[in-house]
UniProtKB/Swiss-Prot annotation:
Organism: Chlorobaculum parvum (strain DSM 263 / NCIMB 8327) (Chlorobium vibrioforme subsp. thiosulfatophilum)
PROSITE patterns per the UniProt record, alphabetical: RIBOSOMAL_S19
An example molecular function term from Gene Ontology annotations: rRNA binding
Entry GO CC: cytoplasm; small ribosomal subunit
Pfam assignment, any one: Ribosomal_S19
Record InterPro entries: Ribosomal_uS19 (IPR002222), Ribosomal_uS19_bac-type (IPR005732), Ribosomal_uS19_CS (IPR020934), Ribosomal_uS19_SF (IPR023575)
Domain of life: Bacteria
Keywords: Ribonucleoprotein, Ribosomal protein, RNA-binding, rRNA-binding
Protein's UniProt name: Small ribosomal subunit protein uS19
Family as reported in the entry's similarity comment: Belongs to the universal ribosomal protein uS19 family.
Example GO biological process: translation
Gene3D superfamilies hit by this protein: 30s Ribosomal Protein S19, Chain A
Length: 98
């Protein structure tokens, strides 16, 4: 269920303050954050935000297409390594001993 329009989007106060300070100074530094639930605003475009995925901080370069999405959508938390088991030989199973 989306957030109520009367409340407005959630953006962590410190994160928004850092981005606005960097915009006024013209800086482009990586901003480290744990706030995966923060909405990406148009002020974030062009900045790199390091979003925590539970283990490390994943650098996310913000583009115009990302505005309105949440930061956590671009930092996957699960790593798929494939299903268990090795490669099967052609021709069936190994020969049986009698």
């Amino acid at each position: 269920m989306p957030r109520s329009l009367k409340k407005g989007p959630f953006i962590e106060f410190k994160l928004e303050k850092r981005i606005l300070d960097m915009n006024s100074k013209g800086e482009r530094k990586v901003v480290k954050t744990w706030s995966r639930s923060s909405m990406i605003s148009p002020d974030f475009v062009g900045h790199t935000v390091a979003v925590h995925n539970g283990k490390t901080h994943v650098p996310v370069y913000v583009t115009e297409n990302m505005v309105g999405h949440k930061l956590g959508e671009f930092a996957p938390t699960r790593l798929y390594r494939g299903h268990a088991g090795g490669k099967a030989e052609k021709g069936g199973s190994a020969p049986r001993k009698k």
